[in-house]
Amino acid sequence: MDHHLDPNLDNLFEMYGESVEECATQVANGTLLTLLQMLVLVWMFFLVWRLSLPPRIQTFLHIAMTTLTVAWFSPKKLESVMIFHTFSLISLFCAVQKLNGYRILGLNIMLLIALQNICSRANADDYFLTLRGVLMMHIMRLSTASFAIVDSNVRSISFDQLTLYLEYIYFPPFIIFGPYVTFDQFVKMREKKWTRFEEQLGVFVQGSVLIFIGITLAIISSCYVDFFEPGSQFVEDALTAMSFRCSHYFICLSTQAFAMFLGSKIVVANPVNIEFSRSTLQTVSEWNRPFHTYLHENIFKRRFFQSTALNVLLTFAVSALLHARDYQMWLTLLALGFIAYSETVFRKRIADRFSMCVAAKPCSVRANRRICKHKHASFSKRVLIINLFFMILSMYHLVFTGMTFTDDYAAIGYPFSHTWTIWGTHYYSSFIVSFAFLALSKII
């Protein structure tokens, strides 16, 4: 769960003007200007791929434009470029030496935390937060390339292979906002052949609609939520959480449009599936699908432990550490992992014990038909009621985990006590429910 993917995002989402209309106008102008700058890069490299330039020139162009992009969007341009390339050089050197991909990932996380400590000592916490999202995405790409190089089982990497990895790592349109794409997805996107004008026009229209919806959600996050007068503390907490989610949706929909313009069909996030999710497990997986794919493929599926619970905990721990030393993000992600795990275990137990289609994930679909062997299928009244209960509970968990992202410490980072204090106003209810689910799963 992170929306700090743009160095200027916090500035974009500041409330402007004295009225909702003034605020909406200025936020729309600010977000549109930033997106237009990124769209220039998108269309530039869309054309570069069509020119079929020599590999050396194309790789040089990727690296040069990435350097300029990092400098353009960063407050301290020279320092940011040096830091960005330091991560790259260390990781690529280790990858070429066939160092284990997990060691490279761990090394990058340690470098990220070390950088945060240096910035903290220099009273530059705000600068680190502007750069953190860029570096987090960069680390994910570097570690993905490292895994691919190590798994290739070749003694030495050819120049053509190396240039392709470098193009993947240094792809300017995805440097600031993202999204994360796997190496295979990048290759498919790069090699896509556009055969019809109607196809390109359809993609342009769909992407434009996504950007329009994203900007609308950014306006809701920055203006309408702040101007609304809550009638109770719970409503205020719900609005705070909704503001956080709307800013996240703005990023996700915008980056999905970028990828779509370049020929990729990846889905970054579907707000409807998050707001009305079947379970907390679905909320977690739908929150940022590419990020979930990265963690699922590179951490969870490797099964470092025999226990599923420990593998879930490790996955969320790595997710938290990718945000550096951010206590609020650590607590939020680990809390989501615990909540999702306990609910999944409990619902599986109910589904097995009473033969009801109420598991955290719905039964599988084959040939457009749902394969359900439960006595009480998904449209049974009792099943509908139980699934509705868990959907409402997932909505509450979104409020519980999102209400801590207030504006108080957004620019410098949240202290450890902040999260616990706000959760305490709800009597740690999500945790109590989760512990109850674990206990009941043993009793039933």
Curated annotation (Swiss-Prot):
Entry GO MF terms: palmitoleoyltransferase activity; Wnt-protein binding
Catalytic activity: [Wnt protein]-L-serine + (9Z)-hexadecenoyl-CoA = [Wnt protein]-O-(9Z)-hexadecenoyl-L-serine + CoA
GO BP annotation list: lipid modification; protein lipidation; protein palmitoleylation; segment polarity determination; Wnt protein secretion; Wnt signaling pathway
Active site, renumbered: H323
InterPro entries hit by this protein: LPLAT_7/PORCN-like, MBOAT_fam
GO CC terms, sorted: endoplasmic reticulum; membrane
Alphabetized UniProt keyword annotations: Acyltransferase, Developmental protein, Membrane, Segmentation polarity protein, Transferase, Transmembrane, Transmembrane helix, Wnt signaling pathway
Membrane topology qualifier: Multi-pass membrane protein
Keyword set includes Repeat: no
Acyltransferase recorded as keyword: yes
One Pfam entry name: MBOAT
Membrane-crossing residue ranges in chain numbering: 29-49, 81-101, 128-150, 163-183, 201-221, 249-269, 304-324, 326-346, 383-403, 420-440
Main location: membrane
Subcellular location: Membrane
Enzyme Commission identifier(s): 2.3.1.250
Organism superkingdom: Eukaryota
PANTHER family: PORCUPINE, PROTEIN-SERINE O-PALMITOLEOYLTRANSFERASE PORCUPINE
Similarity comment: family membership: Belongs to the membrane-bound acyltransferase family. Porcupine subfamily.
Purpose of the protein: Key regulator of the Wnt signaling pathway that mediates lipid modification of Wnt proteins. Acts as a protein-serine O-palmitoleoyltransferase that catalyzes the attachment of palmitoleate, a 16-carbon monounsaturated fatty acid (C16:1(9Z)), to Wnt proteins. Serine palmitoleoylation of WNT proteins is required for efficient binding to frizzled receptors. Has a role in cell specification, specifically in blastomere signaling. Involved in cytosketetal polarity. Required for the orientation of mitotic spindle axis.
Record-given protein name: Protein-serine O-palmitoleoyltransferase porcupine
Organism: Caenorhabditis briggsae
Gene name for this UniProt entry: mom-1
